[in-house]
């Protein structure tokens, strides 16, 4: 499957919430209209063991399938076709780094605009 980044970028220009936030959700849970709900780590609740929290997150994330912005017709179709959930868009300022971390569940990262000197480390 090829992804048209220009179409995605054009649609993302319509999200006014990105003017004041560095990330917003593209998918949400039923009944939620807060574009920030779901950003950040879902592991912040420190009750139970890490294994229990990761198991809970794996279930919770699958509920994030409702399109947050109905006007993102092309972007929403890509998310649906790829079976993605809890998707979000992030904006990073120049000379800013994404912190080194381990995601507890599988992720797909699609850089829309980047610098040729940027890189991502992927290890098992």
Functional labels for PLM-detected ranges:
Residues 87-90, 108, 118:
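A broad, low-specificity signal marking well-ordered, structured residues that form hydrophobic/aromatic
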Residues 101-104, 121-123:
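Short glycine/proline-enriched turns and hinge-like loops at secondary-structure junctions
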């Amino acid at each position: 499957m090829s992804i048209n980044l220009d179409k995605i970028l054009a649609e993302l220009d319509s999200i006014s919430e990105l003017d004041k936030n560095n990330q917003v959700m593209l998918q949400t849970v039923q009944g939620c209209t807060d574009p920030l709900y779901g950003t950040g780590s879902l592991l912040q609740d420190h009750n139970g063991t890490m294994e229990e929290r990761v198991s809970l997150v794996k279930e919770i994330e699958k509920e994030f399938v409702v399109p947050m912005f109905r006007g993102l017709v092309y972007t929403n179709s890509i998310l649906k076709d790829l079976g993605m959930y809890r998707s979000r868009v992030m904006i990073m300022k120049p000379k800013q780094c994404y912190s080194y971390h381990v995601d507890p569940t599988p992720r797909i990262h699609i850089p829309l605009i980047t610098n040729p000197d940027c890189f991502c480390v992927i290890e098992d």
